[in-house]
Amino acid sequence: MDITKHLKPNLVDPNIEESIIKKLKPPVEDYWAPTKSGLHKFYHNFIRPNIYLIIFIIIVLLLLYYRYRRVKADKEKEKLEDTDKEFDKSTNNDTNSKKIYHRQKNSKTLNSSKKQSIDDTELLLQLYNLNKENLREPPITKSNFAYPMYPYHKGGTLISPGSR
């Protein structure tokens, strides 16, 4: 049996070894130190002395934004009222849109204290879509009209001219 241990000889005194490690060990650097110090300087030089001015400016901006939203809502309401008046004056023969409009108008008068079930913009969107559908295709004058028609073929039949 081999009882010999492989021991390393201690050639350097432990005190000297500690001093060497302290000298050779690189210092721990904080990666974000320049950023932290820069933000710290910016805060102390600019923000801290003017904090009340900054708060005042933020409050003024919030008030201006609130006023802008109110004025915009009032203008939209006026436009909506103008379109309602124009719609009443117009002689539109579209019965579907009139039914929807008058049904909504009557529900407004009956439930004036309640919140509207259908928003005015949604109503205008419905009217727009109905008018768009009606304008998409002209009224049909022929009774036996079917798609696809070949208008350049004699008689306008459903069969393509090249298939005969």
Curated annotation (Swiss-Prot):
Entry's transmembrane regions: 46-66
Major place of residence: membrane
Entry keyword set: Coiled coil, Membrane, Transmembrane, Transmembrane helix
Region described as Disordered: 76-114
Top-rank lineage group of the source organism: Viruses
Membrane topology: Single-pass membrane protein
Location in the cell: Membrane
Coiled coil: 72-137
Stretches with biased composition (Basic and acidic residues): 76-91
Any one Gene Ontology cellular component term annotated for this protein: membrane
UniProt-recorded name of the protein: Uncharacterized protein L310
Lineage per the UniProt record: Viruses, Varidnaviria, Bamfordvirae, Nucleocytoviricota, Megaviricetes
